[in-house]
Amino acid sequence: LTTQPVGVISDKMASASLRGARGNSGVILSQFIRGMAKQLKPLEEADIKQVADAIKSGADVAYAAVMKPTEGTILTVMRALSDKALELCGQELEMPAFLEQVIAYGNEVLAKTIDMLPKLKQANVVDAGGKGLMTLFEGALYFLQNNEVIEVQTKEKKAEEPEAPAAQ
């Protein structure tokens, strides 16, 4: 793997996430990444305090981008990640241990989203956007621990052409 400054990587992620955003959670996630990238842009590397500040910036930008923020969604999970990261940034932790604790707390809050919105409770599911956010953080931790990228093959689904009505 090639090594690039964290600021360059985060800037590329912000651009790609906005271009690839799908649905409300995708757009909100792109704003979270944009907020993180803004904080990380000038850096070659990032320490725990800088990552915590970036997560907070991401959550703040995401909340500001939504006209009527709703708790029990991806926003709630973002705020939880931010709160935990800021709480831990004064401790002497290595980055993987820091992320493990941030992720554990994020997953605790994610599990509670089922009770925060009636539609989630009725379907007995957690917020999908929040789950996606946690998967992103878990992937970052996996990479830090294993220095390995998991290749995922995706197919872009194209809209089918409507059939022409039969001539009569």
Q: Where are the regions that the model predicts?
A:
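N-terminal loops that bind phosphate or other acidic moieties
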Residues: 1-168
